[in-house]
Amino acid sequence: MEAKLIQDLIENNKPFRIETAAGRIFEVPHRDFISFSGRKTSLVVNYNENGDEHFAIVPLLTITSAMART
């Protein structure tokens, strides 16, 4: 996945979701829940699971789908 496509979703400041090749799905409710690594080769995604806060480092090469939610 190209960094520009993800950057556009972040700049729209609307919820979106990311799916990885491993089948993981990350819901991004707001731009504060996601950021790029320094070289824009990976994403850092913050998420809640069972009431606990977590983060995942997701290489852009493993992202198979990114789409805005309506």
Residue ranges and their predicted role:
Residues M1-T70:
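Motif-centric detector for short Cys/His coordination patterns
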